[in-house]
């Protein structure tokens, strides 16, 4: 049996091979990897290299046993062992896995970092390359939509709280000239919760104002419109089809508070309503981006609305909000609910109607069908796969060895 750790210099390929195998058997992945955990029970922890080369990412690097053995022999991590006949590998018994206790889970959470600002077509290898000199990373989770599209943000787990803190405190970090939003994972979720609370407060205030406005025709609406003059910013151009309202909130996050965005994904123009003057927010954002204010790396025409165009846009905003509120209420909702899209900007509340067992149902629910009750607890983010899993993927937490058809890292079939 040969242990790794020789002081020979690694080639770039050997370094990638070691990194990949040590990830598979590492503290973060192995406890979550059902397939590998089953394999290591069969032969005192040994896993045949014939099995390992079926793992997609290792398979793309090499299928040559000698190359793998040679690479592991040069690793300084001392995590892996190679069998005497050089056909099997295992995690060294002298490096047992940490016990997955609440304390351990809390430690992992404290060294996890949220990073946003990557292009949606970035690959796991692109992100790994960017993070290569940022500290030792144990895991990268690419956050995806329900349709498996990359959101442009990740969660990265560092090897220690100190290295995570050092990374977070680096000012002005960019990915290919794009500013990145970097927060500790716990701070990110706290920020999202605070935004939801603020939305609920604004929703209640808006509902109250609309209720009072019905008793004073014209007066409330007029005052509201006057208070928003100079606060509208129009944007237009050959926008990316994946451009969304969240991109605008991120772009102006430190320059002006956005109250409402009239924009639908796929459109080529839209309007932003700021709490304060739009001109000031635009100037601050431009100055922070060296005068070149892009949206998903696309050129955009920015224009502060004035005069007749401004009045018409404000009137449309008010009308759309009221129309959406009326439609929702007609389905059984109460004033003060939150609507997504280019309509009312308020927070969700309880719906009318009753579900199974005389419990509250949801607006527009089909009659005669039972509903789920209670709340579903989610961990990490809203992109976690549902249902039983044989193995995950390397960029998401785990990876499954390829069978007859190999898998891509985004879940599609390799060809």
From Swiss-Prot:
Q: Is Cell cycle one of the keywords?
A: no
Annotated GO biological processes are: IRES-dependent viral translational initiation; nuclear histone mRNA catabolic process; protein localization to cytoplasmic stress granule; tRNA 3'-end processing; tRNA 5'-leader removal; tRNA export from nucleus
HTH La-type RNA-binding domain boundaries: 7-99
Q: Where in the cell is it found?
A: Nucleus
How is this chain modified after translation?
Phosphorylated.
Chain residue ranges for the region called Disordered: 349-415
Composition bias, kind Basic and acidic residues: at what positions?
377-415
Gene3D superfamilies on file: 3.30.70.330, Winged helix-like DNA-binding domain superfamily/Winged helix DNA-binding domain (1.10.10.10)
Q: For this UniProt entry, what's an example GO CC term?
A: ribonucleoprotein complex
Domain RRM span(s) in chain numbering:
111-187
Positions of post-translational N6-acetyllysine modification: 116, 128, 327, 356
List the Pfam families hit by this protein, alphabetically. Answer: La, RRM_1, RRM_3
Q: Where in this chain does the record put each xRRM domain?
A: 226-346
Q: Which residues carry this modification: Phosphothreonine?
A: 120, 377
Q: Which residues carry this modification: Phosphoserine?
A: 92, 94
Report the function annotation for this chain: Binds to the 3' poly(U) terminus of nascent RNA polymerase III transcripts, protecting them from exonuclease digestion and facilitating their folding and maturation.
UniProt-listed PANTHER family: LUPUS LA PROTEIN HOMOLOG, LUPUS LA PROTEIN-RELATED
Subunit annotation: Interacts with DDX15. May interact with RUFY1.
Q: What is this protein called?
A: Lupus La protein homolog
């Amino acid at each position: 049996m040969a242990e790794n750790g020789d002081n020979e210099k690694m080639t770039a390929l050997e370094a990638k091979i070691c990194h990949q195998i040590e990830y598979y058997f590492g503290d973060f992945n192995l406890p979550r990897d059902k397939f590998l955990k089953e394999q290591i029970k069969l032969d005192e922890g040994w896993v045949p290299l014939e099995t390992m080369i079926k793992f997609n990412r290792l398979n793309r690097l090499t299928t040559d046993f000698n190359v793998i053995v040679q690479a592991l022999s040069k690793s300084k991590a001392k995590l892996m062992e190679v069998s005497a006949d050089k056909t099997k590998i295992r995690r060294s018994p002298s490096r047992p896995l940490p016990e997955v206790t609440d304390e351990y889970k809390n430690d992992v959470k404290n060294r996890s970092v949220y990073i946003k600002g990557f292009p949606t077509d970035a690959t796991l290898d692109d992100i790994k390359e960017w993070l290569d000199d940022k500290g030792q990373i144990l895991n990268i989770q690419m956050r995806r939509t329900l349709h498996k599209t990359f959101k442009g943000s990740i969660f990265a787990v560092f090897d220690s709280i100190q290295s995570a803190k050092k990374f977070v405190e680096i000012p002005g970090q960019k990915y290919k000239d794009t500013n990145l939003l970097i927060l500790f994972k716990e701070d990110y979720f706290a920020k999202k919760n605070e935004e939801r609370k603020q939305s609920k407060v604004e929703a209640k205030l808006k509902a109250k104002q609309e209720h009072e406005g019905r008793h004073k025709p014209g007066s409330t609406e007029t005052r509201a419109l006057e208070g928003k003059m100079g606060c509208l910013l129009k944007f237009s151009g050959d926008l990316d089809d994946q451009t969304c309202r969240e991109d605008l909130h991120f772009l102006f996050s430190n320059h002006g508070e956005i109250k409402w965005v009239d924009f639908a994904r796929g459109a080529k123009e839209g309007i932003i309503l700021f709490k304060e003057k739009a001109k000031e927010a635009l100037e601050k954002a431009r100055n922070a981006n060296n005068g070149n204010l892009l949206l998903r790396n696309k050129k955009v025409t920015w224009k502060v609305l004035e005069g007749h165009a401004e009045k018409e846009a404000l009137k449309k905003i008010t009308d759309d909000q009221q129309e959406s509120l009326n439609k929702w209420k007609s389905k059984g909702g109460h004033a003060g609910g939150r609507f997504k899209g280019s309509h009312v900007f308020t927070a969700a509340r309880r719906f009318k109607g009753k579900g199974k067992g005389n419990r509250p149902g949801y607006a527009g629910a089909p009659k005669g069908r039972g509903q789920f009750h209670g709340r579903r607890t989610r961990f990490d983010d809203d992109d976690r796969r549902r249902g039983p899993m044989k193995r995950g993927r390397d960029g998401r937490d785990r990876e499954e060895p390829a069978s007859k058809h190999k898998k891509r890292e985004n879940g599609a079939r390799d060809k």
